[in-house]
Amino acid sequence: LFVSKKYPEHWSEEYMQRAHYSLGLFLAQYLCNGFNMADAGRLTYNSYYYQTNGKAFRFNRKKTSRRSADGSEVIVPIIPPLRYILDEIAAPPTRDSFVFPDILKGAETEELRRKYTMQENSNVKDRVIKICHEALNWDKSICPSGTWCRHSFATNLHNAGVDMDYISESMGHSTSDHAITQIYIEYYPLDIQMQNNSKLLNLEDSSERDVLLAKLASMSTEELLKLFK
């Protein structure tokens, strides 16, 4: 739906644009390691983004409760679907600028930033629920929220067989240190992070199948006969 933009015709053009933006933010929360709206509002095109040639974000999680670790670092690999979303709704990359500036609206006080974050959370939830019910015709009992994104990120990667250590570190759950350690980066280099996060949308399986089919197509008749003997 985000790609086709086939929203209900009775919606106004203005509401379609707002709903499209909110759906993009919702999907970005899921693909950005389940981060929350406070993280989305503070996400920037920092030096790490440019060091990786625009292939990953690196940020410190915003503390949202007494139980969460303030300052836990997270690295988000920018897989193709996330890149598509960014191209649609994010601000153009400029060093140290906000990726989603419309969330905080340039607020200079923490009180105002919290207010705008809560407002955006509410807008996204309301519009995504409306999309589910009116555009996708899902059951009325289905009411997605930002919490769904975080839980789904962990659950879907776990079901896909991804290491729990990777999932935990990706969500900023490190208990020993608030920083991404060099060991983690060496153990899960960016290409591995890309592979793992691609499993959020079953992209890796499709990619492997396409590679296999391409190899088979390039083989000669003799090679194929040897393969199936």
Language-model-detected regions and their locations in the chain:
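Basic, Lys/Arg- and aromatic-enriched nucleic-acid-binding interface segment
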Residues: L1-M37, G41
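Active-site/catalytic core of tyrosine-dependent DNA strand-transfer enzymes
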Residues: L1-S4, I79-K140
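Short, basic (Lys/Arg/His-rich) helix/loop patches that form interaction surfaces
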Residues: K5-M16, R95, K125-E169, H173
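Short, contiguous acidic/charged loop-to-helix segments that flank catalytic cores in large enzymes
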Residues: W11-M16, K62-P77, E110-E120, K140-W148, ...
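Conserved tyrosine-mediated DNA breakage-rejoining catalytic core shared by Y-recombinases
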Residues: R42-E88
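Short, polar N-cap/turn motifs at the start of nucleic acid-interacting alpha helices
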Residues: S47-A56, V162-I185
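Catalytic-site neighborhood detector that most strongly recognizes the C-terminal catalytic loop/helix
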Residues: R61-S65, M171-R209
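Short, low-complexity, charged amphipathic interaction modules
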Residues: S207-K229
